[in-house]
Amino acid sequence: MIEAELKARVRDVESVKAALAARSAGQRSKYQDTYYDLADDRLSSEGRELRLRTITTDNGRRSLLTYKEPTIDTASGSKPEYETEVGDPSVIDSLLRGLDLKVLVGFEKHCINYRFVSEGRELLATLVTVPELDGTFIELETIVPESELAEAMEVVRTTLRQLGIADGDLTTEQYTDAVLATRKASGLP
């Protein structure tokens, strides 16, 4: 399955929140993301991602292990994705480190998730702030077979426009790259 997704900077956060709230109740959550790579950085250099994410909400906590293959749609950055829930993230962290993977970067995301249907597709819209980065972002995604990617991307684009997001606000920059660049510019590891 492919995560058909677009990400954009949000210029008018309150208007976008209101437009999303008209479609669905939002759920606040905190993501703690840790990305891993091989010693030679082969995963990231090939556009692959291996992430351990712990999501904390008012309803509890859960952790997911996600592997993403290289981008198949360069305009959006959409990638094939494989994800599973894990019971104990510390065990997975130990397992990955034991297999000689290293932590590439870890960071926190503060999110509000909205689930709704648009043009017959189940969508997840996430308003995101990363404490280390300036601004607010929106991610809008749906999971589809590769054969439906083009149609799904059009629904995602149209829905973003309906939410007040202009095409010029779209970005393919990854949070991992932005956080690493911010830390480097600040002299942090």
Model regions and ranges:
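Short, glycine- and charge-enriched coil/turn segments that flank and shape catalytic ligand pockets
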Residues: N59, E146-A150
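A hydrophobic, small-residue-rich beta->alpha segment in the mid-to-C-terminal subdomain
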Residues: E139, I143-P145, M153-R161
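Conserved, surface-exposed functional patches that form binding/active-site neighborhoods
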Residues: L99, V105-E146
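N-terminal strand-loop-strand beta-hairpin
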Residues: M1-G120, R157, I165-P189
